[in-house]
Structures are given as C-alpha cells and as structure tokens.
C-alpha cells in the first residue's frame, strides 16, 4: 500500500508524490505514518520530515511548523516554510550554526535571547537534516 504525500507552503509545493512511510515532527513528538494510519489532525513542529519513497530510498526535509492532516492514506502538510534536505548546503548550515551559537552567547535582553535560541534551534535542525543517516532496510 502507498500513501499520497503533499507538502505545501505559501510559496511552493515541496512534495507531491506517493510514498511508503513518513516520520513527522509534531508538537507532541515524532510520529511514524504507514498506510492505513488512523485519521489525525496535528500541529507540525519545527523539525525533520523523513520520507520513505516507494523504492525504499529515504529522503529528508525540514518543516518550519504548520499543520498536518492524515486520512484515507493521504497526508497533507501545510507548512509555514520547508526545505528539502538536498537543498541544504552542509557548509552553509555549519556556518549558520556557529553564528547562532555565538549570537546566543552574547544575547542581551529577553528579545535577543529568544531570537538567538530560535536561530540556534533552526540551525541545529538543518544540520540534523543534512547529517541524517537513514535506517538500513
């Protein structure tokens, strides 16, 4: 059996394809979705989206929060923004992580601290997406 996966942002369609499985970051933790999953509507947290294609190859994307609806083997993810793991430059992601860590250490005031923590979280998620090693079949 297959799942129809749609990942949409206000700017573009990130994904529109049949897949075997996904692993999604939600506000209550990560969930795995296989065919015939129980219907669910859930908030999507910032984090990785793991996609298992029909040929058993795994891909990764990064979601920057949103909403997901899973029903009748169809997954619709409406995201605020998203990136495919293959679009992330590892060197750029590492540099962004280093900058975020430096900015956090010199943050002053509540606003600066919150912004620095958010930037650090985003940078770590991007690094995780780039460095993720898929499970062996």
Curated annotation (Swiss-Prot):
One BP annotation, GO? proton motive force-driven ATP synthesis
Keyword Heme assigned: no
Name the InterPro entries on file: ATP_F1_dsu/esu_C_sf (IPR036794), ATP_synth_F1_dsu/esu (IPR001469), ATP_synth_F1_dsu/esu_N (IPR020546), ATP_synth_F1_esu_C (IPR020547), ATPsynth_dsu/esu_N (IPR036771)
Q: Does the keyword Lipid metabolism apply?
A: no
Return one GO MF term.
Answer: proton-transporting ATP synthase activity, rotational mechanism
Membrane topology listed for this record:
Peripheral membrane protein
Q: Which domain of life is it from?
A: Eukaryota
| Signal peptide (from-to) | none
Coiled-coil region(s): none
* Keywords per UniProt: ATP synthesis, CF(1), Chloroplast, Hydrogen ion transport, Ion transport, Membrane, Plastid, Thylakoid, Transport
Q: Name one Pfam family in it.
A: ATP-synt_DE
Q: Where in the cell is it found?
A: Plastid, Chloroplast thylakoid membrane
GO annotations of cellular component type: chloroplast thylakoid membrane; proton-transporting ATP synthase complex
NCBIfam families, sorted: ATP_synt_epsi
Member of which family?
A: Belongs to the ATPase epsilon chain family.
Role noted for this protein? Produces ATP from ADP in the presence of a proton gradient across the membrane.
- Quaternary structure? F-type ATPases have 2 components, CF(1) - the catalytic core - and CF(0) - the membrane proton channel. CF(1) has five subunits: alpha(3), beta(3), gamma(1), delta(1), epsilon(1). CF(0) has three main subunits: a, b and c.
Please report the name of this protein according to its UniProt entry: ATP synthase epsilon chain, chloroplastic
**Organism whose genome encodes this protein:** Triticum aestivum (Wheat)
